[in-house]
Amino acid sequence: MPDYAIGDVQGCYDPLQRLLELIDFNEKEDCLWFVGDLVNRGPDSLAVLRFIYSLPVKPKITLGNHDLHLLGLLFGGQPWKGHDDTLEEVMLADDGEELGHWLRKQSLLCRSSELNIVMCHAGIAPLWDLSKAMDLANELEAVLSGDSYHEFFAQMYGNKPDIWSDDLVGLDRLRVITNYFTRMRYCDAHGRLDLGYKGTLSKAPNHLYPWFEVPCRKEIEMDIVFGHWAALMGRSSHPRIHAIDTGCLWGGQLTALRLQDRQRFSVPGYGVSRFE
């Protein structure tokens, strides 16, 4: 009964099915861990959601920024972002709201002591140890799954605050927690988020670091599995930090990481790379 962490699917239903065939997935025994961004940009977000929702073994899911965007559209009155969105089919589906309520009750962080794994969409803020990250994930999850979710989704967007402080309260506190867990790529040497630059490591401004290389980063005693960052193409500088967004939608692959032995499996995705 292996566990597999799956990279950013982003509505790519056919590659997901090919990947599951490659790993000889047994839906009655195996457990899938989805790193987030189940939806958007790809052609089949509704099919992806329906498939994952129907799995007999409950999957572990950490929410990504595109998942939160869908929830903002469904429940927060957020406007369409533009031509890149491919969420209309979900919005118009008879079961779209039901799927949305299921999605908003998923996690920001999943962990397994047995597998020595912690998973989140974008990463763990350099300023947090694992205990802090777990507490803050629980805090935000309580809002997403609780009665005040409409208010949060209506106001979740924004790049400020851009650094964690224990003194933060209210929406500012929830927004920075959200941005670290779901949007983070680069930080400065003090752990301050930079949400502007999204390019390759080789062209990054000198003052920015990948979140997992920030000099002040607190050590996490478990292996970290994350997605979100297709430009890394599955590579990180740390042997215990596993990047599994391999650009399925951008000329890359869709990747599964078997958590028992950290072996990778990949199938071709769609499109032409925008990172060349």
From Swiss-Prot:
Reactions accelerated catalytically: P(1),P(4)-bis(5'-adenosyl) tetraphosphate + H2O = 2 ADP + 2 H(+)
UniProt keyword Transcription regulation present: no
Gene3D superfamilies: 3.60.21.10
Keywords: Hydrolase
Any one GO molecular function term: bis(5'-nucleosyl)-tetraphosphatase (symmetrical) activity
Domain of life assignment: Bacteria
EC number annotated for this UniProt entry: 3.6.1.41
Pfam family of the protein (one): Metallophos
Family in the record: Belongs to the Ap4A hydrolase family.
Purpose of the protein: Hydrolyzes diadenosine 5',5'''-P1,P4-tetraphosphate to yield ADP.
Protein name: Bis(5'-nucleosyl)-tetraphosphatase, symmetrical
